[in-house]
Curated annotation (Swiss-Prot):
Subunit composition and interactions: Interacts with EGFR; EGF promotes the interaction with EGFR. Interacts with PTK2/FAK1 and BCAR1. Tyrosine phosphorylation is critical for these interactions. Interacts with Rho GTPase-activating protein DLC1 and with the regulatory p85 subunit of the PI3K kinase complex; in resting cells, interacts (via C2 tensin-type domain) with DLC1 but, following growth factor stimulation, TNS3 is phosphorylated which leads to weakened interaction with DLC1 and enhanced interaction (via C2 tensin-type domain) with p85 while DLC1 interaction with PTEN increases.
Protein name (record): Tensin-3
Region (Disordered): 358-421, 538-568, 618-695, 717-769, 859-981, 1076-1127
Impact when changing T323A: Abolishes phosphorylation. Abolishes interaction with DLC1 and p85
Record InterPro entries: C2_domain_sf, PH-like_dom_sf, Prot-tyrosine_phosphatase-like, PTB, PTB/PI_dom, SH2, SH2_dom_sf, Tensin-like_SH2
Class in the EC hierarchy, top level: hydrolase
EC number: 3.1.3.-
PTMs per UniProt: Phosphorylated on Ser/Thr and Tyr residues. Phosphorylated on Thr-323 in the C2-type tensin domain following EGF stimulation which changes its binding preference from DLC1 to the p85 regulatory subunit of the PI3K kinase complex. EGF induces tyrosine phosphorylation in a time- and dose-dependent manner. Phosphorylation of the SH2 domain enhances interaction with PEAK1.
Family per record: Belongs to the PTEN phosphatase protein family.
Domain C2 tensin-type, first and last residues per copy: 175-301
Length: 1445
């Protein structure tokens, strides 16, 4: 059947319309017809039609039509299986939502794609067939048979048939990975004169190339069977395409022999055979023999199949593996040219392990627009090979050195599923078993876009679940020309270089890579800085500019995403390169509210949040800390050793960067050492002789200190006993560092993009022109055997400190992006990822987040080292022993203005002082805190938008942003010790935009006298006045509380402090005060901040030792806070002197008396916000809680009347006169003693509404803290509670608590959760039942099908509603049958259905039995509804309520 030559509009049914345009019609004709069709649709259907665009995305189409869904895929190809399901679900949802709705299927090109959609939807609706739809199905079948069936490709029909089988249940999804060993062609195609054929094969997974074979030369005298050996075996999973080409002998062209697509889920057994009629292209090609067929041979392992020798070719078949012909490299479907072929630059096929990219002169011509136009001169000789990017990823190929710039190729369109589509698809496919069970596969592509002039590099990864320690493979990219044995540079970190797999005799140095699901390097830590001959870097704005690109990893996605930075040849010393990792917390939305023009907030196509930060381009100075370099494993070691190795914080020699016109260089850092002696010339400070020994001593010292206060504390294992198997001891087990996030870019610097990664303990900054690659939500949770204990917590949460009050950004060259990292313990924090939680919204309130549960959406899990105490869910972080920090209400950000003076020869040191006013200790809660981090503890600020945790040695670190320079050019300062427990100061120049943090186990021993040498100030030339303090001691805390940021608001980062836990161990945090003299400030130069990380609990001990001097200057008028909603810092009109909060420790030995010297006072404070912030209680509940308390008692809650505001309810001594005049009854007067005030959130901060004399505060904690000191506009001072008022009510008045619980239960609560499984427990109950049920579920084969259910708790019991009716419709468990509810005591996470989620369950009586129990398991689904909130509600409100129904 031939396709038509004009517009074809067909009403398939009354509500399904197909509109197709021939591929050859002109643009004018297409646009004219499109406008006509649009007018007809609008006149007939109004805005009630949805356009499903099966072709490339077009602006015209989007502009003309109100609702359009771009779901296109390449013509003549089968769509991905998940896309088919997405289209069907979207179509059904749209048609069912309104009887007036119609669907318009638009396609430009072959109608085969329309046939795919119509036949798929026909099968989709047939599952839930009804009589009234029978006519529609008949109409669709008739259209399919008459119009489009003959136009469909065999692969398209194969996919439709597979989907039909899945929907009907006749086909069971094969979820196990398959390793392809052989592709056998039965029958030699006759593509050249004399029966000669020169086939070569390409394998694609998710339309990305993963393997390219050599060229097989088959003559007419050879047998009619060609066996293409895939060596090493290629792991395939999901949508697979095999494409076979014939390379013409005397011309630079190739012909497609056949193409076939299939889904591995449909493969039953280990063999597939496709006849000629099943092959795309070949089915209608006379050159392919009629008896010909293609056979694929799989196995379950990558090992060579025993007894397969007979399959190999005889000696007459010659295989050419070593070719640099660019013809072989055209393979990426990422950017399609007009004829559907893919253009590709030359790349390796000889199996080289490392791939490299060389820049070429921009004046040289690139590869022309099509396969026919490749000049022979583009195949250089083989004498001088440079490793280039191989899009096949299975094979990196040696190609010749050309020294040319990137070629620009024809434009193409590419679209991934939107975040919402993916979320819906996850739900839809979860029943089919299509969800990716933790493993993700990304392939390397090297394609160019005409409009961006860039190179897309997406390295291949293959991850294997379970114990596939020797089976998985990964190829990444290096750009250094170095011997294979020279793997001591950071570049080696970019590739997991293991040679434990078999080598092919033809593949040279290519080896089988070993990887695992949590392979950190597989997340893309492999790009390196290079040189830019033009000396100019232009970022990628999607415009017509050349520049560095980024790459991102997507979670569970099979579609290519954004590219990564180009890999270029570095200058002289390639041994030290920087790696970068970015991080994003859900609290970023707080800061985004007040982002100034310097920041933009957007979402990536797959729902990943993106920060775009601009910084001045005219700031030439740049000093940055570079990561230390560990010894990377040699070729004979496992790549997991590389994954588990840490990179310390080390200097970057100046000669690694090309001097730019602006003379940007990198001075050395006096406080940094090189770990493992990665270069003696790099070591500028004393290196510890035995870092492992130092770490162990520090850990044990901390253990002893904590045991003094808490005998139940379980000592943290030391490096020796926990990591005895680790190859080198360059990293502490508590290294959970992140990387760094944002830095300034100078457009005229001469260096390429680079990475800076705090990998298990590195402090790193991104150099000039650098740009962080995007990291996605990929899972890296390693199941493989032999895993070292701390590898799962190897990456802490990284973050970004932005100082966005910048000058107007001059050009697009100043934009850089920071993306979210993927890490299973942190994945709950990504707002844009879990979108489907709102699909089934109910009017029932959400579960109140009780004091045990936080009020933000982030989540951090126990790393393997954390003590096994009962876990409490926390979206922010889990402190030792299950303590959880609070979020918004107790967070407080501080700003310390930097004076315009260099740091003196003696750098600032911290000292601790335990004396403080109790009320202020409690009120200040989590404001300014520095505390210690025991090994293995991962810290995260619960409402911190971005923050970096970097670990290099057990020394505390504070980051300051100075203001002795133009606003918006922050000065980062870090306290990093040259030796253990000797905190010293080193600084970054103003062009750096980050403030790195080190989370540390902090030994409380006396710090030695050693200070940073005077050279530490060599690069600080901001002034000459000494740093000192002109403030009295009592102003120190007030200065932090009242520091305004000058003219423009600066988003700064709230902190989280630890609170009291169930075991009664109070968690204390350091409160660091950095006073100083502010004489050098001008109003326009203030506005920088200090961010101090919240840390795990420490014993309350004094450190009476050497006095410390402060860095920076603070005055009460130059301080600020971060608003929970605005995220910006604001000016607070405080009195010059605040009450005396603290006294300096008398035991401290003062420094020499000098006008600017002052002691730094460090205070312990306790988090109390969880006592007074009750987000979800009602006004009546607040009155009930407070009416019997003493005056000054208060509660802060979320306002129900004013969205986004807070309500302050406080008890007063006497009611207002207006109330007394009403002669109310005594009972009513008691209620009137509780007065209510509205706390409004404004761009300036939070304040009491309607009170003119009330200042603005940066957070609720700050507001509460100040009003506990002076009442201001309130009737009296606030009394900071020392315990939870809910607990007091429960103890003092059980009946009151019961009534409150009954009210909550009557109202009910509900949210969406993942339903995992129901396991019969006989008579077992309690935590053991939850633990056993989850253990059974995790090993169950096949794994149980999970689905999203609506979980409602009411006075009648628990009701589950399956949103998609996949497993059941509705289940109800009466309240008297529910026995127990709790989180998993082992704190295991559910990662199958997306981000890592906590698991909880409840035990209920089995229906009809008085003794048998059933445990029902669930996992978190909605980030705003943590599992602990649900468990608390069920346990304390429903089960704990005496009024059972």
């Amino acid at each position: 059947m031939e396709e038509g030559h004009g517009l074809d509009l067909t009403y398939i049914t009354e509500r399904i319309i197909a509109v197709s345009f021939p591929a050859g019609c002109s643009e004018e004709s297409y646009l004219h017809n499109l406008q006509e069709v649009t007018r007809m649709l609008k006149s007939k259907h109004g805005d009630n039609y949805l356009v499903l665009n099966l072709s490339e995305k077009r602006y015209d189409l989007t502009k003309l039509n109100p609702k359009i869904m771009d779901v296109g895929w390449p013509e003549l190809h089968a769509p991905p299986l998940d896309k088919m399901c997405t289209i069907c679900k979207a179509q059904e949802s749209w048609l069912n939502s309104n009887l007036q709705h119609v669907v318009v299927i638009h396609c430009r090109g072959g109608k085969g794609r329309i046939g795919v959609v119509i036949s798929s939807y026909m099968h989709f609706t047939n599952v839930s067939a009804s009589a009234d739809q029978a006519l529609d199905r008949f109409a669709m079948k008739k259209f399919y048979d008459d119009k489009v069936s003959a136009l469909m490709q065999p692969s398209q029909k194969r996919y439709v048939q597979f989907l039909s089988g899945l929907l009907s249940g006749s086909v069971k999804m094969n979820a196990s990975p398959l390793f392809l060993h052989f592709v056998i062609l039965h029958g030699t195609p006759n593509f050249d004169t004399g029966g000669v054929c020169r086939p070569f094969l390409k394998l694609y997974q998710a339309m990305q190339p993963v393997y390219t074979s050599g060229i097989y030369n088959v003559g007419p005298e050879n047998p009619s069977r060609i066996c293409i050996v895939i060596e090493p075996a290629q792991l395939l999973k999901g949508d697979v395409m095999v494409k076979c080409y014939h390379k013409k002998y005397r011309s630079a062209t190739r012909d497609v022999i056949f193409r076939l697509q299939f889904h591995t889920g449909a493969v039953q057994g280990y063999g597939l055979v496709f006849g000629k009629e099943d092959l795309d292209n070949a089915s209608k090609d006379d050159r392919f023999p009629d008896y010909g067929k293609v056979e694929l041979v799989f196995s379950a392992t990558p090992e060579k199949i025993q007894g397969s020798e007979h399959l190999y070719n005889d000696h007459g078949v010659i295989v050419d593996y070593n070719t640099t012909d660019p013809l072989i490299r055209w393979d990426s479907y990422e950017n399609l040219s007009a004829d559907g072929e893919v253009l590709h630059t030359q790349g390796p096929v000889d199996g080289s392990l490392y791939a490299k990219v060389r820049k070429k002169s921009s004046s040289d011509p690139g590869i022309p627009g099509g396969p026919q136009a490749i000049p022979a001169t583009n195949s250089p000789d083989h004498s001088d090979h440079t490793l280039s990017v191989s899009s096949d990823s299975g094979h990196s190929t040696a190609s010749a050195r050309t020294d040319k710039t990137e070629e620009r190729l024809a434009p193409g369109t590419r679209r991934g599923l939107s975040a919402q589509e993916k979320a819906e698809l996850d739900q839809l496919l979860s029943g089919f078993g299509l969800e990716d069970p933790g493993s993700s596969l990304k392939e390397m592509t090297d394609a160019r876009s005409k409009y961006s002039g860039t190179r897309h590099v997406v390295p291949a990864q293959v991850h294997v679940n379970g114990d596939a320690a020797l089976k998985d493979r990964e190829t990444d990219i290096l750009d250094d020309e170095m011997p294979h044995h020279d793997l001591h540079s950071v570049d080696s970190l970019g590739t997991l270089s293991s040679s434990e797999g078999p080598q092919s005799a033809h593949l040279g140095p290519f080896t089988c890579h070993k990887s695992s699901q949590n392979s950190l390097l597989s997340d893309g830590f492999g790009s390196n800085v290079g040189e830019d001959p033009q000396g100019t870097l232009v970022p990628d704005l999607g415009l017509g500019m050349d520049g560095p690109y980024e790459r991102e990893r997507t979670f569970g996605s099979r579609e290519p995403k954004q590219p990564q930075p180009l890999l270029r040849k570095p200058s002289v010393s390639a041994q030290m390169q920087a790696y970068g990792q970015s991080s994003y917390s859900t609290q970023t939305w707080v800061r985004q509210q007040q982002m100034v023009v310097a920041h933009q907030y957007s979402f990536a196509p797959d729902g990943e949040a993106r920060l775009v930060s601009r910084c001045p381009a005219d700031n030439p100075g740049l000093v940055q800390a570079q990561p230390r370099v560990p010894l990377t494993p040699t070729r004979g070691t496992s790549s997991r050793v590389a994954v588990q190795r840490g990179v310390g914080s080390g200097p970057h020699p100046p000669d690694t960067q090309q001097p730019s016109p602006s003379k940007a260089f990198k001075p050395r850092f006096p406080g940094d050492q090189v770990v493992n002696g990665a270069g003696p010339e790099l070591s500028t400070g004393p290196s510890p002789g035995s870092p492992t020994l130092d770490i162990d001593q520090s850990i044990e010292q901390l253990n002893r200190l904590i045991l003094e206060l808490d005998p139940t504390f379980e000592p943290i294992p030391t490096h020796m006993n926990a990591l005895g198997s680790q190859a080198n001891g360059s990293v502490s087990p508590d290294s959970v560092g992140g990387g760094l996030r944002a830095s300034s870019r100078l457009p005229d610097t001469g260096e390429g993009p680079s990475r800076a990664t705090g990998r298990q303990g590195s402090s790193a900054e991104q150099p000039l022109g650098g740009r962080l690659r995007k990291l996605s939500l990929g899972q890296y949770d390693n199941d493989a055997g032999g895993q070292l204990p701390f590898s799962k917590c190897a990456w802490g949460k990284a973050g970004v400190d932005y100082a966005p009050n910048l000058p107007p950004f001059p050009s697009p060259a100043d934009v850089k992006e920071t993306m979210t990292p993927g890490y299973p313990q942190d994945l709950d924090i990504i707002d844009g990822r879990i979108l489907s939680s709102k699909e089934s919204m109910c009017s029932t309130p959400a579960f109140p987040v009780s004091p045990e549960t936080p009020y933000v959406k982030t989540a951090l899990r126990h790393p393997p080292f954390s003590p096994p105490e009962p876990p409490l869910s926390s979206p922010a972080s889990q402190h030792k022993g299950g303590r959880e920090p609070r979020s918004c209400p107790e967070t407080l950000t501080h700003a310390v203005g930097m004076s315009e003076s260099p740091i003196g020869p003696k750098s600032t040191m911290l000292r601790a002082d335990a004396s403080s006013t109790p009320s202020f200790q409690q009120a200040f809660a989590s404001s300014c805190t520095i505390s210690s981090n025991g090994p293995g503890q991962r810290r995260e600020s619960s409402s911190s938008a971005e923050r970096q945790w970097v670990e290099s040695s057990p020394k505390p670190m504070v980051s300051l942003l100075g203001s002795g320079r133009p606003t918006g050019s922050p000065l980062s300062a870090e306290f990093s010790g040259t030796r253990k427990d000797s905190p010293v100061l080193s600084c970054f120049p103003p062009s750096e935009l980050q403030a790195p943090f080190h989370s540390h186990e902090l030994s409380l021993a006396e710090p030695p006298d050693s200070l940073a040498p005077p050279s530490s100030q060599a690069f600080l030339g901001f002034g000459t006045a000494p740093v000192g303090s002109g403030l009295p001691p009592e102003e120190d805390l007030g200065a932090l509380l009242a520091n305004s940021h000058g003219a423009s608001p600066t988003p700064s980062i709230p902190l989280t402090a630890t609170g009291a836990a169930d075991n009664g161990f109070l968690s204390h945090n350091f409160l660091t005060v950095a006073p100083g003299h502010s004489s050098h400030h001008s109003p326009g130069l203030q506005g920088q901040g200090v961010t101090l990380p919240g840390q795990p609990p420490l014993p309350e001990k004094k450190r009476a030792s050497e006095g410390d001097r402060s860095l920076g200057s603070v005055s009460p008028s130059s301080s600020g806070f971060s608003s929970p909603h605005s995220g910006s810092t604001i000016s607070i009109p405080f009195p010059n002197v605040l009450p005396d909060f603290s006294k300096a420790s008398e035991a401290a030995s003062p420094l020499p008396d000098s006008p600017g010297d002052k002691l730094v006072i460090v205070k312990f404070v306790q988090d109390t916000s969880k006592f007074w912030y009750k987000a979800d209680i009602s006004r009546e509940q607040a009155i009930a809680m407070l009416k019997d308390k003493e005056p000054g008692s208060f509660i802060v809650r979320d306002s129900h009347s004013f969205r986004g505001a807070y309500g302050l309810a406080m008890k007063v001594a006497t009611p207002p006169p207006s109330v007394l005049q009403l002669n109310k009854k005594a009972g009513d007067l008691a209620n009137e003693l509780v007065r209510h005030f509205l706390i409004e959130c404004t761009p300036k901060g939070v304040r009491l509404k309607g009170c003119s004399n009330e200042p603005y505060f940066g957070s609720l904690t700050a507001l509460v803290c100040q009003h506990s000191i002076t009442p201001l506009a309130l009737p009296c001072k606030l009394l900071i509670p020392e315990r939870d008022p809910l607990e007091e009510i429960a103890e003092s008045s059980p009946q009151t608590a019961a009534n409150s619980a009954a009210e909550l239960l009557k109202q009910g609560a509900a949210c969406n959760v993942w339903y995992l499984n129901s396991v019969e427990m006989e008579s077992l109950t309690g935590h053991q039942a939850i633990q056993k049920a989850l253990s059974i579920t995790l090993v169950q084969e096949p794994p149980p099908v999970s689905t999203v259910v609506h979980f409602k708790v009411s006075a009648q019991g628990i009701t589950l509603t399956d949103n998609q009716r996949k497993l059941f419709f509705r289940r109800h468990y009466p309240v008297n049958s529910v026995i127990f509810c709790a989180l998993d005591p082992q704190d295991r996470k559910w990662i199958k259905d997306g981000p890592s989620s906590k698991v909880f369950g409840f035990v209920a009586r089995k229906q009809g039995s008085a003794t048998d129990n059933v445990c029902h398991l669930f996992a978190e689904h909605d980030p705003e509804q943590p599992a602990s909130a649900i468990v608390n509600f069920v346990s304390k409100v429903m089960i704990g309520s005496p009024k059972k129904v």
